[in-house]
Amino acid sequence: MIRVRGIFIGLALFPCVLLAGKILESSVIHDGAVYRLSITARLEAPLAVVYQSITDFSNLAAINPSIEESQVLESQGSGRQRVRSVVRVCILVFCKRVVQVQDVTLVNYRTVVATMVPGAGDFRAGLARWELTAVGTATDLHFTETFEPGFWVPPIIGPWLIEKKLVREVARTTLYIEGQAGE
């Protein structure tokens, strides 16, 4: 899943960033085969709307058009679900459909934790965490993820491209969530 804090370089390349919530920070660290992502964004939407949007696992495509499909595979008890999603990821002219299967835990009304299921998708391992904080009528979303892809990522430009893609996707997602808040 794509995780997240960041530097918005190339605003000219991603004009949707200016229309969406504000990206406060982002970073990507590459260590061997493992990536560590972090991003914080401020959404002009109430915490309850943001939480509902990011936990509607059967309808994630509604908040990000890069998500081609998402579904709950099974409920694993109170606040735990196994979720499968397919994301179309394009970097430059290369596109790939990435499958991820995660065991998702709704920790409380503002925290979600997802653990990749090894062998069930295109990742060897991964752990993601979403933390929401109300800031007046807005919400800060802090997303972190550590993952090891099961596919090749170019080592020299990979971290830079992943950060660019992450920032763009978070910006697109905030735009959709803010649109839902305005309805």
Role assignments for model-derived ranges:
Residues 1-11:
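Bacterial N-terminal signal peptides that target proteins for export
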Residues 15-16:
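N-terminal signal peptide c-region/cleavage motif recognized by signal peptidases
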Residues 20-78, 94:
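Hydrophobic ligand-binding cavity/cleft-lining segments
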Residues 30, 74, 104-106, 130-136:
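Short, low-complexity Ser/Thr-rich regulatory SLiMs
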Residues 36-38, 95-101, 123-129:
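Short, surface-exposed coil-to-beta transition loops
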Residues 42, 71-120, 172-183:
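Glycine-rich portal/gate segments that line the openings of hydrophobic small-molecule binding cavities
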Residues 52-65, 166, 170-182:
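Sec-exported extracytoplasmic/periplasmic mature domains
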Residues 117-164, 168:
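Beta-strand/loop substructures that line and gate deep hydrophobic ligand-binding cavities in soluble
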